[in-house]
Amino acid sequence: MANSTGKPTSSTQEDEEATSATEILAQLMQDIIDREEDIDDEDDIDDEVIDDEDYEVASLPLLQESQANQKQSREREEETEKNQPKRFKKQNMMKINIHDFSEETLRLIEVWYEAELDPQDIFGDNEVTRLFSRPIKKQLMSSDVDKDQCMLMLSKEQVKEKMLPFLEDSENPVKGIDVSVYGPDGKVQQMEFKMWNGDKTPVLTSGWKQFVEDYGLSMTCDFVTVWMFRHIKTRKLCFAIHYVKFSLRD
């Protein structure tokens, strides 16, 4: 339809634009179909098949970046482990200075570290609990036996995983918890279990110094195994500690 000037009406313009848009859309659809057919044809040619893994990485730059970061992380971990004895790399829970010990002693330390000691041996026939925590093993350092500080420092991650589940809601290690600590001969001493240096490091203190003196513990050569448990009768929070000495290199 035209107006008095002979120009197409707005309705005609809209029809033509709709027709043009339809034609463009149809052409785009045909182009897509043609490209898919080309891809199907290429898939039939063995030497032009795209490897799935390469395709995914090329299509996902974030994945490619993630893989690169993972590789860098593995390289950093390998670099960190270079100075650690091979036998301790898998556990990666207790690092020691290998230069302090002979190869024979390092093998003995490995056996000790992997062995599952029975804490009930400390108590003999006396039943104090039916459930011990999983043990924490560590080499005593200067901070553990220094007379000016003298507190047994424990791994925060291991305490969180192995020991904190034994605590009751009313027990707050940040404020400090009075505990009974059983030595390797079954003798008991009173100590405090608390978070030291803010809430960064779990420690046994307020009695640990006497424990060190009673058993003649020393840095480097002495290694301890520590369990937590709740006394079967008193329900009091307790620790059991066993230690072993290894000879230092001459």
From Swiss-Prot:
Compositional bias segments (type: Basic and acidic residues): 72-84
Localization per record: Nucleus
UniProt-listed CDD domains: B3_DNA
An MF annotation (GO) of this entry: DNA binding
A Pfam entry, by short name: B3
Manganese listed as a keyword: no
Keyword Isomerase appears in the UniProt entry: no
Region (Disordered) residue spans: 1-90
GO CC terms of this entry: nucleus
Biased composition (Polar residues): 1-12
Coiled-coil features, chain-numbered ranges: none
DNA-binding segment(s): 137-245
UniProtKB keywords: DNA-binding, Nucleus, Transcription, Transcription regulation
Domain of life, source organism: Eukaryota
Regions of compositional bias (Acidic residues) in chain numbering: 34-56
InterPro entries on file: At2g31720-like, B3_DNA-bd, DNA-bd_pseudobarrel_sf
Name of the molecule in the record: Putative B3 domain-containing protein At4g03170
UniProt source species: Arabidopsis thaliana
Source taxonomy: Eukaryota, Viridiplantae, Streptophyta, Embryophyta, Tracheophyta
